[in-house]
Amino acid sequence: HAFADTFYGNRARVPDLEAVATAVFSYPNVGTVGLTEAEAVAKYGHVRVYNSTYTPLKCHVGQAHLDIKERSKDYMKILVDTATDKVVGIHVITDNAGELMQGFACAIKCGVTKAQMDLTIGIHPTAAEELVTMRTAKYEATKEGVTKL
C-alpha cells in the first residue's frame, strides 16, 4: 500500500521492510520474518534466543518404521529484544512455512511480545503450536558474544 498511497493517494509512506515475511518453497520450506540474529544484535544489542528442533507428529506416524534419529526434523527460532520483550524475528524450517509466516508477520508488525505469545493457546497438532509453546530461552546474544542459559 505504500506505493499506492504515495503515488495515488497523496500520502507519502515508506514501507516497513522489517516485518515482511519471506519463504523458500523447498522441501521442507524455509520461512522468515523480521530480523536475523546478527541484525537483531546490531540493532538492539542484547537478544534472547529461543529455538527448537523437533520431530513433527506426522513423522512419528508416517515414519514409524525409521529410527527416531532418522525421522524428519523441523527447526524454529524466535528472537526477542531483552529490553522490551518484543519479538523481532522468527525463522522456521518446516512444511508450509510460507503459510505459517504470514500470521506471524502480522504479529511482529503489531509489536507482539514474547509474553503475549506465551499466553496464546496453540492449535494442536500444528507447527505454529511450537512457536507459542517455547518457554525457555536457549541463549542470549550480544555484540560481545553468546551466553548459554
Regions found by a protein language model. Name each.
Residues 25-36, 41-149:
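Flexible, glycine-rich terminal cap/loop adjacent to redox cofactors
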Residues 1-17, 85, 126-127:
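Rossmann-like dinucleotide/flavin-binding elements
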Residues 1-4, 21, 36-37:
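A general structural signal for well-ordered alpha-helical packing
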Residues 12-29:
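Flexible, acidic loop-helix segments that line cofactor/substrate-binding pockets
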